Design a protein with these regions (language model features):
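Positively charged, Gly/Ser-enriched RNA/tRNA-binding surfaces
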Residues: 1, 9, 43-221
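Short, glycine/charge-rich beta-strand/loop segments that flank catalytic centers
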Residues: 2-12, 31
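Short acidic alpha-helix initiation/capping motifs at coil-to-helix transition points
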Residues: 5-6, 34-38, 51-54
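Short, well-ordered alpha-helical packing segments
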Residues: 12-15, 28, 98
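Short acidic, glycine/serine/threonine-rich loops at helix termini
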Residues: 13-18, 124-126
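Acidic, His- and aromatic-enriched active-site or binding-groove loops in soluble protein domains
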Residues: 19-44, 133-135
Length: 221
């Protein structure tokens, strides 16, 4: 698998430098589709759903598509930040994450800095990530999340930071099935007949017998 990470402060800072901070929601939602569609379609959506001009949308796409090693991308982002405080804070946070995973023994080819990762939801405030299966990248992200400060403010006046993640169980199960990682059936029965009324047990037994005579493996429970 590959973890693709980014930081919302970097994205928000870059938008602020372009005078588009108040247009972050529609722009980031458009960027979130970059892995699923082509850049031209994303650019069209950005200009249609926000006040971004074609020139600004082109600049945004060029910024989020920087390439290289994690270290090289961070160096490029620092130059593009041009001293912008929030952007630099996001870049520094990404450095800490990358250094921390290295210290923890995580294979560095499993952690990729991807500035196009946006996580379209508004509440993310810091590091964000999406996880893809190397053998089945087309299945999409199977685990994603990030940091969100003060999301609990919806329910309490106390300011509380938070980090969350979600697993795509349906995608994981589909991937495991396609890769042959799921065990076969543990029971020979194809049908399970359940009953809750002991007084009608004979009726349920007759149903099971009729089904078995049709060649079906049935278990009564």
């Amino acid at each position: 698998f590959t973890l693709r990470i980014n930081n919302r402060q970097v994205l928000n800072g870059l938008l602020e430098q372009l005078g588009l901070r108040d247009q972050a929601t529609p722009i980031l939602r458009a960027l979130d589709k970059l892995a699923k569609t082509d850049a031209e379609t994303v650019m069209e959506e950005m200009t249609r759903q926000s006040t971004a001009t074609t020139e600004q949308a082109t600049k945004i796409l060029s910024l989020v598509q920087v390439t290289g090693t994690n270290g090289e991308i961070l160096d490029q982002l620092e130059k593009l930040a041009d001293g912008h405080e929030a952007t630099l804070e996001g870049i520094e946070a990404l450095r800490h994450v990358i250094e921390g995973t290295q210290a923890a023994g995580v294979a560095q080819d499993a952690l990729v800095l991807d500035v196009s990762i946006a996580r379209g939801l508004d509440y993310y405030t810091g590091t964000i990530y999406e996880t893809f299966l190397n053998a089945l990248p087309q299945i999409g992200s199977v685990c994603s999340g990030g940091r969100y400060d003060n999301l609990t403010g919806v329910y309490t006046k106390q300011e509380l930071p938070g980090v969350g993640a979600s697993l795509g169980l349906d995608r994981l199960l589909a991937a495991m099935e396609e890769l042959g990682l799921l065990q076969g059936h543990r029971t020979p029965a194809k049908l399970l007949v359940t009953y809750f009324d002991r007084d009608r047990l004979s009726d349920y037994l007759r149903i099971c017998t009729a089904l078995r005579r049709r060649g079906l493996a049935v278990e009564l429970f």
